[in-house]
Amino acid sequence: MLNKKKKILIAGLGNANVTADSLGPKVVNNLYITRHLQKEGIASYQFELSAIAPGVMAQTGIETSEILESLAERIKPDVVIVIDALAARSYSRLNKTIQISDTGIAPGSGVGNHRNEITQHTIGVPVLAIGVPTVISVPAIIHDVFGEKSLENVSENIDEEFISMHVTPKNIDESMKRISYTISEGINHLLHN
């Protein structure tokens, strides 16, 4: 998908102030951005890379999909790459799996905070999504440990607030540094070497 694409916009989704949700902004902070260098004639690169960490709707009052649609109309990228933290369905994938999709993403859907989807249909250009599961729900943990039958039995006896809770490992700070660096360096190497 990237071999013929020259103008790339990367969007680091998530809340930079919440460690488990800060993957996107952390990746953006480590990228080697080149759009401004090419526009000013300072340097020439195979790819024109621009990036944004748009925050979350609670910070901006604007759907991230609206921000990206407006940016795509203005700077006309050939492809948008979105990077976001995800919710795991299994503890074995927590902070260990990097998922890549060419169908876009629905931010917040893993934790029940459904936002407008970010897809080629909504943005107007192809969308690649890169995500890492950084949180897991209590029901997913119960299912991992005890199986489906126990999940049904336990769910009946647990407070609704507890069932809707998402948790993250205690080493999330270190994991986030490592994962965000791995993704950003992978992108930097792919686009600039």
Which residues are covered by each model-predicted region?
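Extended, charged alpha/beta regions that create polyanion-binding interfaces
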Residues: 1-8
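Conserved acidic residues
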Residues: 8, 78-79, 127
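Glycine-rich phosphate/diphosphate-binding loop of Rossmann-like nucleotide-binding domains
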Residues: 11, 15-47, 51
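Gly/Ser/Thr-rich loops at beta-strand to alpha-helix junctions
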Residues: 13-21, 58, 85-89
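Conserved active-site and cofactor/substrate-binding residues in soluble primary-metabolism enzymes
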Residues: 22, 26, 63-67, 75, ...
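A generic local secondary-structure boundary/capping motif
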Residues: 40-42, 68-72, 115-120
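A structural-propensity feature for long, helix-poor, extended segments
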Residues: 45-71, 76
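A structural signal for small-residue-enriched, beta-sheet-centric alpha/beta enzyme cores
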Residues: 52-53, 82-193
